[in-house]
Amino acid sequence: MNFRTPEWVHHAIFYQIFPDRFAFSKKLVKPNNLESWESAPTNHGYKGGDLLGVLEKLDYLQDLGINAIYFNPIFQSASNHRYHTHDYFQVDPMLGGNQALKELLKEAHKRDIRVILDGVFNHASRGFFQFNDILENGEKSAYLDWFDIRGYPLNAYQGKPNYRCWWNLPALPEFNNDNPQVRNFIFSIAKYWIDEGIDGWRLDVPYEIKDDEFWQKFRQIVKQANPDAYIVGEIPMDASRWLAGDQFDGVMNYLLTYGVWQFFGGNEVNTELYGHWINAHARDLKIENAQDFAVYIQGLLEKYPHEAVLAQMNLFDSHDTARFLSILNGNKDRLLLALLFLMTYPGAPSIYYGDEIGLDGGIDPMCRKAFPWNSSEWDPQMLGFYQGCISLRKAHPALRDGEFKVLYAQGDVLGFLRSKGEEKVLVVLNRSREIQHVDIDMQGMVPDGAVLRDLLASGEVVEKEGFLKDLILAPLSGMVLKELK
């Protein structure tokens, strides 16, 4: 099979935006009953963020170094997260409607910023037209076989649901994806928005649709509409089944997330926030030192085809997890060290909105705070480090799609080489609170006597007789070394 993933994804820096919470434009008329922007988020309240607000902040994203946006759902819905879809062909009016998306796509593409949307195709909402028709017409509805109905009248609001729904939540009736009409409907959505100019789909809980043929056909239709479109699935477990070349290009790389949390967090994590996600998906994972982490991350690279590895969406938090800063009990040095790893490891890094300015938050809804646009509330050191790491990745092709090789993994120190052609970049990370002295074997990788420059701090080290000897690493710090020529 000729498996190819979009080249642009290999060089992407994603920025995940929760539309209700990122930015709002004064050009749109808003409902009166909105929560204040600055107040703590709630499960059901709206704050009024919209797509024109995002458009007005494209300068900010461009300055940060972002070249791809992943939006949480934007279609008409009766929930602030919009995973309860009413109409898949209409952008929610509160977000500015279809016209706002059209304008945003135009301006983003002018800046070479790609845009992918969240596709929720396993389930819809009680307000979805076809399901609502069943609520109104019962056994006489023309859409009975769009869902798995088990009794009448439907218990959509009271009592135990008598139809199949996601996580037994009556607000989320599951589609009958064995029905050809349902399949064709979903495929038409996928094609419609690709034709409208989006650059790909992030697929919500695609593992709930058990039929591989469904996603194979989905890929065929999307790639026919745009061969360069990106298809990325939300798969919080081993994704080999979906990454064989006939379904998805990549997945949200939660397997990497779990390892990053363990290695860089060490024994200093907030166990409640950490355990909320880990206990459900990676209870048996034990990473106690750099050796364990090296074996783990090398295994992830070997698990999938190389094309899929380059198209992974690598993240350390999202709308479904506590923010990593809060998992780390506010330790920003550990977060920045993890960021340096994320920006130098194979796969496309993804930043959850606000992480770059020090936004914190526990589990949902606190991980979905509104972005504070008063810069006095930002952490300038953190923002600067994010910008620097992004610039570093963009400036050095080896960090994006070069080969990866672990050179050192002992105790709390990890060192790995990224290489592409003549370019070789050595990354060394110290997660310890103590100064570390390490010797790294560089035999055959750089000439004897080569001078390597730290791209982060502009210091220099000299290779002697095949080794970088007595490399001194400050606590919770890293080096990115490249040979001077």
Q: What spans do the regions from the language model cover?
A:
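C-terminal beta-strand-rich structural cap/linker in extracellular carbohydrate-active enzymes
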Residues: 464-485
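Carbohydrate-binding surface patches
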Residues: 407-445
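The substrate-binding groove and active-site-proximal loops of carbohydrate-active enzymes
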Residues: 39-51, 84-97, 168-183, 200-209, ...
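Conserved, mostly hydrophobic/aromatic
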Residues: 17, 61, 71, 88, ...
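Active-site-proximal helices and loops of the catalytic beta/alpha 8
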Residues: 105-111, 123, 128-139, 188, ...
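Hydrophobic faces of well-ordered beta-strands that scaffold small-molecule active sites
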Residues: 13-15, 69-71, 115-117, 201, ...
